[in-house]
Amino acid sequence: MWSSDRLAGAGSGGAVVTVAFTNARDCFLHLPRRLVAQLHLLQNQAIEVASDHQPTYLSWVEGRHFNDQSENVAEINRQVGQKLGLSSGDQVFLRPCSHVVSCQQVEVEPLSADDWEILELHAISLEQHLLDQIRIVFPKAVVPIWVDQQTYIFIQIVTLMPAAPYGRLETNTKLLIQPKTRQAKESTFPKEGDAHGQVHSYGREQKGLSKELQTRQLHTNSEGITASNGRDPKVPGGPLKPSWWAVLGSMLSFGPDSKQESAWGSLELGAFKNMQSQAAPLEGTFRVCQVQPPSARTTTATSVFHKHCTAHVFPWDQEYFDVEPSFTVTYGKLVKLHSPKQQQDKSKQGVLLPDKEKQLSKSPDHKQISSNRSEEAAEACVLKVVWNGLEELKNATEFTESLELLHRGKVWIPDDLRKRLNIEMHAVVRITPLETTPKIPRSLKLQPRENLPKDVNEETIKTVFSSWVQQSATTMLPLVISKEERIKLEIKDGLREFSLSTVHSQEKEKEEGKTVFVLSSILLQKISVQVLLEPMIKEEQSAEIDFLLPSLTLSSLGGVSALGASAMEHITHSLLGRPLSRQLMALVAGLRNGALLITGGKGSGKSTFAKAICKEAQDTLDARVETVDCKALRGKRLESIQKALEVAFSEAAWRQPSVILLDDLDLIAGLPSVPEQEHSPEAVQSQRLAHALNDMIKEFVSTGSLVALIATSQLQQSLHPSLVSAQGIHTFQCVQHLQPPNPEQRCEILHSVVKNKLGCDISNFPDLDLQCIAKDTEAFVARDFTVLVDRAIHSSLSRQHSSSREDLTLTTSDFQKALRGFLPASLRNVNLHKPRDLGWDKIGGLHEVRQILMDTIQLPAKYPELFANLPIRQRTGILLYGPPGTGKTLLAGVVARESGMNFISIKGPELLSKYIGASEQAVRDVFIRAQAAKPCILFFDEFESIAPRRGHDNTGVTDRVVNQLLTQLDGVEGLQGVYVLAATSRPDLIDPALLRPGRLDKCVYCPPPDQVSRLEILTVLSKSLALADDVDLQHVASVTDSFTGADLKALLYNAQLEALQGRLLPSGLPDGGSSSDSDLSLSSMVFLNHSSGSDDSAGDGECGLEQSLLSLEMSEILPDESKFNMYRLYFGSSYESELGNGTPSDLSSHCLSAPSSVTQDLPAAPGKDPLFTQHPVFRTPSQEGCQDLTQEQRDQLRAEISIIKGRYRSQSGEDESLNQPGPIKTTFAISQAHLMTALAHTRPSISEDEGKEFAELYENFQNPKKRKNQSGTVFRTGQKVTLA
């Protein structure tokens, strides 16, 4: 009975209801609340009423007297129902319409002459209450309108603009009413009409009706006058009054004036009228673009239309133009519409909008925003309008309505005119037809707006002006100007700006509309031109109105050509920049391809790359760019950040197609850096901002806006999960990651940076080898190259002793000098470990292991190009296993130093954390650090602690760590320039999945050293020690079975201590002079102050030392502060505390002062002044007070002081022959006895039983089949096992 496919815009749901007639004085459909909920109806939504007749469309309201148990009954006014062909009790099908067009203009006709007369009498009442009676209209509908409580009239809907099956009346909709007179032959209308279907009526009563031909609007608070409904007010009854009601009269009948113009100027006026009558210009809003249309690019068109005030209008699909396009020229008025941000700035300055207009400015319905007359600027410009592709503009109406676009097409305005009118690029303007009859000026006045050359006179200016008029206007296409114009004339090979003023003889008439004048070369001959040579007062230079982006484009950046092409492809499809995109995605919602996310490390060039994409989109797609610097918003209140984002999104929607750039989005909508901050205020604010951003994007998707979104972030995972989640709205569907550049890309970046900074080609520097520099700049990013080039330029200027860049010559040596001491940004926050200054010659034994490491790591690092051509996959992971102390960690450091790569050492437990996800994040961060520092060696020590077999951990932490390691070691991306080394003594505990090919695929066994290897180890370790002639390392190697490399090193350390103790203490002391068992510890000896209060402070001669023992100068005993730490090493930290922590000079006065009565020469240093008059005393740690020294103690102390003297003199370079003959190091030579003594007290770290266990364990690890053939293991109840 009812067709479900009658309207493409109808919704899918519906309901069958019974019609009931009421006496309600409106045209609404009254529905019960239950039915409203069932149909999911929205306010002001249209409803299709389908019956046996043609479907109709009505607006609805909720009936107040319905109860919840009411049946499906829809009530409607009796007169409305009868006109729609319905009867009470009929069943109809209701279906909600998903898309309702806001009407800009509606043409209606009273059904009879009586209705027209009643309408004239109640015009004011109708303009106040019309929207309370009807909201949804459709062509050919006949509806009743109540003018009071008892009286109603019928009107018929003729046409809607824009053309649609149905539409909604708004507060700013123009309503054009055709008069209905009683004259029998009143239907004789001419064929001419404008684009809105306006017709002309001639009759006896036309002048009588002119009093009511007033331009009214549906809202009485507005002060605007619709420019499209103006007419010549020279009719009886006075001037037109502004209101919101548009009565259709003789809009385009430029009828005879009360005082007609003479024959002078009749050709120009006739051409103007003919042009306006033949063309059917479209009234609407257009977007200002920067690309010239074909009418402005062609030579012939430019000569006629491009000389003065001319606007070129063309449809969105300008690619469909022919080689020689056709265009139509009319005259019109252009006025700028304020954007939401400009309205907000205007309101801040004190200009308050009416309440309802504020609501419209906040409404998401862009149609209401675009047609809001209060947003128009007060000053309109009269100009020529060149319509390119007029038929395409008419046909584009349906396309633009389906996408809910703000603008019907594009308009190009010359820069001079655009800046004079203060219209920025990508602004929105309204163009309306010029319907007033132009006047003939009686005189013209020219006055320069700037100083003219002294030799310029009035006749010169008149001649130039006459030539300008002849080029800009013809008789058939006259020049239309307003009362005040600005023109540019060529004076003395330069353009000078003049002010052109017109004077009309009939100035006594006060006209509401703006008077325009017609001008041509013929008329100029009869018009007096007055020239004033005195310049006008120059206005202040206005600020730049256009938003300027950085000049860097994608072509000027190096190393990102592939990423740039992919990103631009995405943005082009998102903004429907190609015909195929328009055909495939025209009916898809906004953000068609999703947003673009650009990620990369610090200094990788994310912001520069994103701005270059925006620049490319602005140049090629004519897109508006709105940039939001999230770094500047960081730390501000949530409301301020949301407001900044809303302003950017609203501006982008107003000026669409647009691109929004959210730079450093992770700073305001990111994840906390550590799990402890998940509930911090910053994390809560980031979560709320992420949800708010999602809501804004959903709104753009629902409205179908032509807006593309670009965001930058360090990592995709650093954004809030709601923005990158796979569920819900897919915000970022394209992710471009800026990887560290390879050598070829580094060369391109260097080339582009040098070219951008110096403005010259790289061929001007023959001594500059960029490929050589690129090889030395591993791990450099874009910012590093910028700084490096600056340093190289500084080095070159310093070398040439010049400050001028014109004579600058860059060479490879300048860059090499700039690289010295320069640390790239990627390595500044990376905790790199500098390996010890060791080489392969410092390692004894392990020849096979060393060769494997050289072939796997060192050679590929030194010759990367050679190994890159090999047809095999290079190994990047090696596991070193063996007993403790066999040199696994030492090998990792040596191979890092020999290969010249960066070295990152990780101890296993430092990656583990109690927070869920923190351990996996720590693993990811380690590999990110390694990638940033590549070429790099990533060394995991104690690998079994972080990668045990899965299934043995109750918490599951290590299981997740193993899974993360598997992903990082052999993921989809793979490791480039990162070698992974792992060391363990228990390879059987490591998860076997990590040891499979592609991960740690090479397991290298580091065995305990045999006798030959032990001899090599002893030889290498003893190179830095002083060995006596009797040392036999071969014998030591033979008697140190089961010793590892670490044990042999400890053995040599112990032997060195034995030699030191044997030299310090006499052989006659008990236990070999062991300082640990004797009270003769050097650290316990102090020199007491003579004024310390002790009774023994001035001991007698028996307790004193021999004077020859202390025959040292003051400079020898107490050196300066920089070398005083050596003295504290022997006398302990208590030495200063006993003396009050004094300075060296104070110490000398306290420790070595003596009464003047004692003056004796020291035999050991004849000729020296005495330094001591009191004898040192000795205090043991277990005793209180002081104790006299024995002869043996004096001898020991004498030997120790001799050693101190020798060490100090050897360090200070003094002659050591005074008190100690021979070199000092001979006293510390390690003898065979020392080695044997140390060997007696040293045992291997791995016992014999433990060695057998390790050997069996490693044998089973190397031969898994042998382990399987062994007897089965007995498992106890509850024991956890793994199948790995």
From Swiss-Prot:
Polar residues bias spans: 1270-1284
Enzyme Commission code(s) on record: 3.6.4.-
Record-linked Pfam families: AAA, AAA_lid_3, PEX-1N, PEX-2N
A GO term, aspect molecular function: ATP binding
Keyword check for Transmembrane: no
Residues making up the signal peptide according to the UniProt record: none
Ranges annotated as biased composition (Basic and acidic residues): 343-373
Domain notes: The N-terminal domain shows evolutionary conservation with that of VCP, and is able to bind phospholipids with a preference for phosphatidylinositol monophosphates.
Name the record gives this protein: Peroxisomal ATPase PEX1
Organism per entry: Mus musculus
